[in-house]
Curated annotation (Swiss-Prot):
C2 domain: residues covered: 1-105
Positions that bind Ca(2+) 1: R22, D23, D74, D76, D82
Subcellular location: Cell membrane; Nucleus
Protein name: Protein C2-DOMAIN ABA-RELATED 10
Assembly and binders: Binds to PYR/PYL/RCAR abscisic acid intracellular receptors in an ABA-independent manner, both at the plasma membrane and in the nucleus.
UniProt cross-references to InterPro entries, sorted A to Z: C2_dom, C2_domain_sf, CAR1-11
Gene designation per UniProt: CAR10
Protein purpose: Stimulates the GTPase/ATPase activities of Obg-like ATPases. Mediates the transient calcium-dependent interaction of PYR/PYL/RCAR abscisic acid (ABA) receptors with the plasma membrane and thus regulates ABA sensitivity.
BP-aspect Gene Ontology terms: abscisic acid-activated signaling pathway; positive regulation of abscisic acid-activated signaling pathway; positive regulation of GTPase activity
Gene3D superfamilies in the cross-refs: C2 domain
Transmembrane segments: none
Length: 180
């Protein structure tokens, strides 16, 4: 039976930093995002180890414990695409901040709600702040790629609850509602 999602998570894929070289002097990178049964892909940026995508990908989050996997590939015309690293996106700290609900309305614009430190248990390369900004909660992350010699990916998370979504606060408290 198909379960209604808690909400929609928009992942703003901003850019790659110092990605590995997989062709002669450069790479043709693109990103694949996987969460549960959903797979999304960015466009290929040709001949660039510091690509700028500035693309938004939105995934339905049904189970907040299912990992979001980001994998970078090098596009090849004649052979299989080469893997250029991967990272898991840990959304648990972000979801905890969302559960603050109405308390957030009292915060000043630009206020950092929570700071997440890099550790062995996440793929962060630097501290990441979860911020209340213009009526939304966002989190900027720079992810260190695993299984590769170098490379980072800069993304931003943003949550949306629309019609047909259970909502993050109602899932933890049994039937609340959210307002925007």
């Amino acid at each position: 039976m198909d379960q209604k999602p808690l909400g929609l998570l928009t992942i703003h894929v901003k850019r790659g930093i110092n990605l590995a070289i997989r062709d002669h002097r450069s790479s043709d990178p693109y990103i694949v995002l996987n969460v549960a049964d959903q797979t999304l892909k960015t466009r290929v940026v040709k001949k660039n180890c510091n690509p700028v995508w500035n693309e938004e990908m939105t995934v339905a989050i049904k189970d907040p414990n299912v990992p979001i996997r980001l994998t970078v590939f090098d596009w090849d015309k004649f052979t299989g695409d080469d893997k250029m690293g991967d990272a898991n996106i840990d959304i648990q700290p972000y979801l905890e901040a969302l559960k603050m609900g109405m308390e957030l309305l009292r915060l000043p614009n630009g206020c950092a709600i929570k700071r997440v430190q890099p550790s062995r248990h996440n793929c962060l390369s630097d501290e990441s702040s979860i911020v209340w900004n213009n009526g939304k909660i966002t989190q900027d992350l720079i992810l260190r790629l695993n299984n590769v010699e170098c490379g980072e990916i800069e993304i931003m998370l943003e949550w949306h609850e629309g019609a047909g979504c259970r909502g993050i606060t109602s899932s933890s408290k049994g039937g609340g509602s959210s307002s925007t």
